[in-house]
Amino acid sequence: FLALNPQGLVPVLQADDLLLFQSPAILEWLEEVYPKNPLLPKDAAGRMQVRALSAMIGCDIHPLNNRRVLQYLRNELSVDEAEVIKWCNRWISEGFAALEKRLVADKTRGKFCYGDSPTFADCYLIPQVSSARRFEVDLNPYPNIVQIDAHCRTLKAFADADPMQQPDAPNA
């Protein structure tokens, strides 16, 4: 795998002779190559909104509770599991609180983070909600996030992509 991606991280997508890595780049590539199934709104303001929501999750929440960071906490700093869960809970909760406020204030929100069709933001959100559940985050303060998650999970693409359904899914 390191021959494909020297970082040793997912996602990596191989499309013919092209090797794609990093979620933002892969999503942008999909948007350009498969325009009939857009994940971004048509208007510039809508695209900005979706990218901003995506960045809130992908840049401000996820990096603090990704597998590599958690393994470092456990293995190098000898942080016990209860403290790891506390760490994740804190950072996910803080990020979700800000995201929930954005979703409440956004008049364009429909069934998804933006509008009535899936966007980049939903692609970022749903795996993070899985992490939140795994790390015992109380989701009650985030009803919009919970509603979006529930709706997305009715779609086959989201169900198939669930992190806990993957062959390398962590046990804890």
Label each region the model flagged.
Residues 1-83:
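GST-like domain detector, emphasizing the conserved glutathione-binding G-site
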Residues 3, 154, 163:
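Phosphate-coordinating loops and pocket residues in cytosolic domains that bind phosphorylated ligands
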Residues 31, 128-129, 162:
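Active-site-flanking alpha-helical
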Residues 57-154:
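GST-like fold's C-terminal all-alpha helical module
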Residues 66-67, 162-165:
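Short coil/turn segments at secondary-structure boundaries
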Residues 119, 166-172:
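Carbohydrate-binding/catalytic loop surfaces
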